[in-house]
Regions:
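Pre-Walker A (Motif I) flank of P-loop NTPase domains
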Residues: 70-76, 106-109, 158, 274-276, ...
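Walker B catalytic acidic pair
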Residues: 164, 180, 188, 331, ...
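Walker A/P-loop NTP-binding motif
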Residues: 62-74, 85-103, 120, 125-129
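Conserved nucleic-acid-binding Ia/Ib motif block in the N-terminal RecA-like helicase ATPase lobe
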Residues: 47, 54, 102-172, 180-183, ...
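The conserved Walker
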Residues: 78-82
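Interdomain coupling/hinge region of P-loop NTPase helicase/AAA+ cores
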Residues: 110, 129, 137-140, 149, ...
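N-terminal intrinsically disordered, low-complexity tails of helicases
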Residues: 1-63, 477
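Arginine-glycine-biased low-complexity disordered regions
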Residues: 4, 28, 296, 322, ...
Length: 477
């Protein structure tokens, strides 16, 4: 057995959905006040959710599911972590359960997402529901085996979860045809547009017959998303709940003005805290450098970015989810695949580009009804820029000058680190350790304790990759 096969086997065995979808026993008791039953969902899906203690829908789910069940086009405005996966997954699975025979290479429903990590999490979240409904689904994304994806498509599936680049690859190869797609979901459409995938999204939507149902979920409607809505959606009903700008009121915000020579010390003091923390850096090299500097000061941190192999990324994410690594230093793109409900603090080592990026980064904390904190480090000459950005983001806080050890630094929940470097021989085993087989935390949101599966490296696309901005996202497709 190859290394890749062993990894895939182990990851599947450890996935909570692999356990849950095969769990035996009678139906769970559905109480009279079950919120999902009131939405008109089939009993088997309501019982499957109840078995995992999921009985009350999130606002985005309660708002969109009835319209989606009725076949309406739906435009959902909600931030990451608001429960969108079940909002589109439950009605889609319900509508697919009409007994229509599946055909080779022709899925009946498509979920399009920006990154492979998000694709994995969507697939894992829907797996028990697909299983109990007697349907088949498949995940196709870069970094996973072409052969397994092509074989599954040839056998016939009902629901396809895909990233834009890999799906276009498979369409070019003749491995999948979209002429039988009845339901199309675009999840985090604004992120796909921001990553340069508008051309791919357009090609995919053009290959799907008119008249089908389309569900689009996006935090914003700029960057080309409004054009997609106008061109491909028919009289969509719009639901806007738990938007990113409103959510900032559930967080505490700190903008710390620091001198350049104090940046490393303040970064380590803020990051040295209890609970999961995500640190944002602008570049791949920056994430590696900051994670290394934190470990040199005694803060256990690992970096995550598109320059790492898929195997390493999966292990780093697993270590972060399981608490073996409490601090994750990530680029904006890599962080879009992180869906962990209990992140207590987001630290921006450099100010974001604009208020929208501030909101997207902030959305990694204060999820699923929890509280959280957002800390931004800025140099004195960036004060006015930060004040404008905060105003645009709807954040009521003022930048303050600080030095290492100041009360305003410690007020973020941090503390002075030990100063004892964490040696490589202590750090590396925490990343390489096998993930613990456990059920993840479950809340009525879009991702409930999902674990990643390991796949092979992505194969080449016929004719090579396009040059320009889209090429830089090769590892994310």
């Amino acid at each position: 057995m190859t290394f890749e096969e062993r990894e895939a086997q182990r990851a599947e065995a450890d996935s909570w959905t692999a356990y849950a979808s095969k769990a035996k026993g009678g139906p769970a008791e559905v109480t009279a006040d079950n919120g999902f039953a009131a939405l008109g969902l089939p009993t088997l899906l309501v019982e499957r959710l109840a078995r995992d203690g999921i009985a009350e829908p999130f606002p985005i789910q309660a708002a969109t599911i009835p319209d989606a069940l009725a076949g309406r086009d739906v435009l959902g405005r909600g931030r990451t972590g608001s429960g969108k996966t079940l909002a589109f997954g439950l009605p889609t699975i319900t509508r697919l359960g009409d007994g229509t025979k599946r055909e080779s290479k022709r899925p009946r429903a498509l979920v399009l997402v920006p990154t492979r990590e998000l694709a994995m999490q969507v697939s894992d979240a829907l797996e028990p529901l697909v299983h109990v409904s007697g349907l088949r689904h498949k995940l196709v994304a870069g970094g996973l085996s072409y052969d397994k994806q092509i074989d599954a498509l040839a056998k016939g599936i009902d629901l396809l979860v895909a990233t834009p680049g890999r799906l276009v690859d498979l369409m070019d190869r003749g491995a999948v045809h979209l002429d039988k797609v009845e339901i199309t979901i675009l999840d985090e459409a604004d992120h796909m547009a921001d990553m340069g995938f508008v051309e791919e999204m357009t090609s995919i939507l053009d290959a799907i017959p008119e008249g089908g149902q389309r569900l689009l979920f996006s935090a914003t409607l700029d960057r080309g998303v409004d054009t997609l809505v106008e061109k491909y959606m028919t009289d969509p009903v719009t639901h806007s709940t738990d938007d990113a700008q409103a959510a900032v009121t559930t967080m505490s915000h700190h903008v710390l003005l620091i001198d350049p020579q104090d940046k490393k010390a303040v970064t380590s003091e803020v990051a040295n805290r209890q609970g999961p923390t995500i640190v944002f850096a602008r570049t791949q090299l920056g994430t590696d450098r900051i994670a290394r500097e934190l470990r040199e000061r005694g803060v256990l941190a690992a970096s995550l970015h598109g320059g790492l192999s898929q195997a390493v990324r999966n292990r780093v994410l697993g270590a972060f989810r399981e608490g073996r690594i409490p601090v994750l230093v990530a680029t904006d793109v890599a962080a879009r695949g992180i869906h962990v409900d209990d992140v207590g603090l987001v630290l921006q080592v450099d100010p974001p580009r604009d208020h929208k990026d501030y909101l997207h980064r902030s959305g990694r904390t204060a999820r699923a009804g929890e509280s959280g904190a957002v800390v931004t480090l800025a140099l004195p000459h960036q004060k006015r820029m930060m004040e404008r950005l905060l105003e645009q983001a709807g954040v009521d806080t003022a930048p303050v000058r600080v030095k290492p050890g100041d009360a305003n630094v410690l007020a973020t929940g941090g503390s002075a680190p030990s100063g004892q470097p964490i040696p490589e021989e202590q750090f590396r085993p925490l990343i390489e350790a096998a993930p613990r087989g456990r059920q993840g935390r479950r809340t009525p949101g879009g991702s409930r304790g999902e674990h990643h599966r390991r796949g092979d490296r992505r194969g080449p696309r016929p004719g090579g990759r396009p040059s320009g901005r889209r090429a830089q996202w090769e590892g994310e497709r």
